[in-house]
Amino acid sequence: MAITRWFFSTNHKDIGTLYLVFGAWAGMVGTALSLLIRAELSQPGALLGDDQIYNVIVTAHAFVMIFFMVMPIMIGGFGNWLVPLMIGAPDMAFPRMNNMSFWLLPPSFLLLLASSGVEAGAGTGWTVYPPLAGNLAHAGASVDLTIFSLHLAGVSSILGAINFITTIINMKPPAISQYQTPLFVWAVLITAVLLLLSLPVLAAGITMLLTDRNLNTTFFDPAGGGDPILYQHLFWFFGHPEVYILILPGFGMISHIVAYYAGKKEPFGYMGMVWAMMAIGLLGFIVWAHHMFTVGMDVDTRAYFTSATMIIAIPTGVKVFSWLATLHGGSIKWETPMLWALGFIFLFTVGGLTGIVLANSSLDVVLHDTYYVVAHFHYVLSMGAVFAIMGAFVHWFPLFSGYTLHSTWTKIHFGVMFVGVNLTFFPQHFLGLAGMPRRYSDYPDAYTLWNTVSSIGSLISLSAVIMFLFILWEAFAAKREVESVELTTTNVEWRCGCPPPYHTFEEPAFVQAQT
């Protein structure tokens, strides 16, 4: 029974649970890798060995956190669980394809881990730039295995995207227009469109890299008329939409959490929120070369990419101020998800401001590949995406399980995590401004102080992760069942009960259009 239920599942709730468990497991692997990085950098001098093994760890940390933690949890976990409930659909549009989307991930993860275990590992960074990723600098199967891993993860995401787009457009009640669906549904829809348009470009780029390595083509080799810069354009045309894919579902979840715990029936400026997400999705495709300011582009090209990048701050600002406006005049309940949401708004804004700094091409030439960039994207990911995931998990855990988490423990956990991530990443701004480069396992001892502080912060974050596991165990051990849920009229996912039955909406939801 268990085998057929979990291996052959076509139920969106079960598949969502599989995604959440897989993502949590991968998140712990990614956390372990990050602690190896911070251990190496905690003092000058070598700890683990040479820069190759260090860069293999950095590369694996990035891939694990992006493709096996954030995306499976946000899109696969929360998306699968909540989207059908929020639009009144009995399941996803293609339930068996949904199952395949999940089961492509463990083999993909296995290939990624295998790439670290053969030869010298793939020490290329998550960008996998040639010629470093070519068959001279990386002889052996490591990079090839990484490419195959990315192929599988990419196919998984493309299939998932097709599924979500079809479900959201096609399976809501006829009386409901797209502009009456919850913001999280919009966020997943826009994310799915971004995935569908960007991943094939990555697939093309890494497939050409694969043939350059194995079939003697020269797509990225100047000796045969190729150009390594072409790879960078292909990669970043995927890579920049990807970072918006990582944060957009978080935007949707934060909108729900802020409205719920402010006691509001809807977020402030619903239409503005939707259009802002659409604008971010569109603009995300036309700014990719801001990752390449140092490759020698024309000044007019640099001017365009600087300006276009800064424009993204406008719809992002619309969202931030709409969240603050949602809080205004509400009866605010200071429960843990609200703490995560407020932390998200503040820290994501800090990360966004350093992003505005880096958008200036002249400044970026100086700051490129320093720890300033690392600090920037970890503020929007480690404190944006992760805070959104944590807030959403604490908020919707009673829906998924029927049990409540211990509110005091979750608040302590938030406090520890907040201190840990800020202590880890805030000093990295100082290191970057002082010129410490990324992707090196050692540094001059002038940089010792802030690296040590950063590494201490990472240990505090680790203790928060361990505390979270305890909180999860405590909830299932104590079995405090959900008594009642407030505001279900405007939060439709709660209306079928906690937890909802295995099959919901077996007959279509009836919606009376308001005249």
Swiss-Prot record:
Localization, UniProt: Mitochondrion inner membrane
Catalytic EC class: translocase
Binding-site list for Na(+): 40, 45, 441
Positions that bind O2: 244
Cofactor mode of binding and number, as noted: Binds 2 heme A groups non-covalently per subunit.
Pathway involvement of the protein, from the record: Energy metabolism; oxidative phosphorylation
EC id: 7.1.1.9
Record-listed Fe(II)-heme a binding positions: 61, 378
Recorded superkingdom: Eukaryota
Regions of this protein lying in the Mitochondrial matrix compartment: 1-11, 87-94, 171-182, 262-269, 328-335, 401-406, 479-515
Binding site for heme a3: 376
GO MF assignments: cytochrome-c oxidase activity; heme binding; metal ion binding
Subunit organization: Component of the cytochrome c oxidase (complex IV, CIV), a multisubunit enzyme composed of 14 subunits. The complex is composed of a catalytic core of 3 subunits MT-CO1, MT-CO2 and MT-CO3, encoded in the mitochondrial DNA, and 11 supernumerary subunits COX4I, COX5A, COX5B, COX6A, COX6B, COX6C, COX7A, COX7B, COX7C, COX8 and NDUFA4, which are encoded in the nuclear genome.
Name of the protein in its database record: Cytochrome c oxidase subunit 1
Organism in which the protein naturally occurs: Tetraodon nigroviridis
Gene from which the chain derives: mt-co1
